[in-house]
Amino acid sequence: MLRPILAAYREAFAGLNRSVWLLSLATLVNRSGTMVLPFLVLYLVKNLGFETTEAGVAIGLYGAGGVLGSYLGGWLCDRVAPRWVIAGSLALTGVGFLVLGRLTAHPSIFIAMVLLGLVGEGFRPATSTALAAAAPPELRTRAFALNRLAINIGMSFGPSVGGFLAMRSYEWLFIVDGGTCLLAAAFLLVAFHGGTVRSEKQETTAHPGRSPWTDGPFLVMMGLFFLLALVTFQMTSTFGLTLRDLYGLREGEIGLVMAVNTLLIVAFEMILVHRVGALNPVRLVGLGGFLFGLGFAMLPFGSTFSFAVCAAVVWTVGEMLSFPLSAGVVANRAGDANRGVYMGLFTISFEGAWIFSPILGTWIYQTWGPKTLWLGCGVVGLVLLVGFQAVAAWIERERKTA
């Protein structure tokens, strides 16, 4: 029984080259030190005397800087090697966190948050561009899944350690987070001093030089990705409120429900992505979005810890289908010369939702109630299912006439 399971894991990871593994390792180092942002609101309110709304503005300013940073990072990747963009983003972010920990005045912190978002979020499209260049088209989705595995392992470690450090002194959060950013940048420069391994098979689109701004299916997918992210980011805002208010769960139990998401991704995402590799990825992204919405739409119909876990399992399966596959779809849609811009715009669709999702979600939660919010997420899931099926049909017609 154990042998087939081990064989499935070997198959899921097989074929990924050295560059993909090293990029994912750098991500793991970086995410293992992620401590500042998860605790920033608490730090600003508790230590610096910010009002809750002012702390929210600071987070929003980071997101606003991140929108520009995502596009800039992708744009730069079409002009210089992505590894330089990644290393530069990490190094500047590391210095930025060290400086932020020394600031106390409101205006200086607001300015610092914009700049941190600008330099920090360029890391995402640059990493995606580097992964796409390193992996052949048929392995790109698995390369993105491996990077997501590194993110989830790191994020399960960093914030938990950060909580203990914060009890001693918040200063340690800025030191450790900044230090791991600098360490990851140094690791990349050393590991890739001779350049990255590039796949021999690159161009996968019939229009390799086409601008993303004239790519109809991609622009529609941008809107759908934004809707997907609006639903997704409820996990970091109103999901916890619902488990507290409607389910009566305490912080520890809420943390366990959240942990189900990470555990399932770490254990099964690579295998799942490998198993569905022969199916239409655009249609699967739509199915993933539907399951995301369905898992959230289940919430008003239960009130127990076990039911919350079941709902988390459903939307986690949706996440495992939609997130790595969507990155692969965008990477394969682009040509070599403009993949950075494509990945930058793809990242912007999520960065934009990061700004609006908590505002919209909490407003609906307070004004119309949690049931309306979660059933609304279910409706969005249906829109995503239908929308991505329509885009898939559009792309198939496009290929036939190319």
Tell what function each PLM region has:
Residues G69-A81, F268-P281:
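Helix-to-loop junctions at the C-terminal end of transmembrane segments
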Residues G101-A112, P300-A311:
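Helix-loop junctions at membrane interfaces in 12-TM secondary transporters
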Residues F13-G63, L219-L224, A229-V257:
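Helix-loop boundary and gating motifs at the non-cytosolic
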Residues M35, G63-V67, Y71, M155-S156, ...:
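Residue-level signature of mid-helix packing/kink "hotspots" within the transmembrane helices
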Residues W84-L98, R283-A297:
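Structural signature of the two symmetry-related core transmembrane helices
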Residues F174-L189, W374-Q389:
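Symmetry-related core transmembrane helices of the 12-TM Major Facilitator Superfamily/SLC fold
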Residues M1-N17, H193-G223:
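Juxtamembrane intracellular "pre-TM" segments in multi-pass secondary transporters
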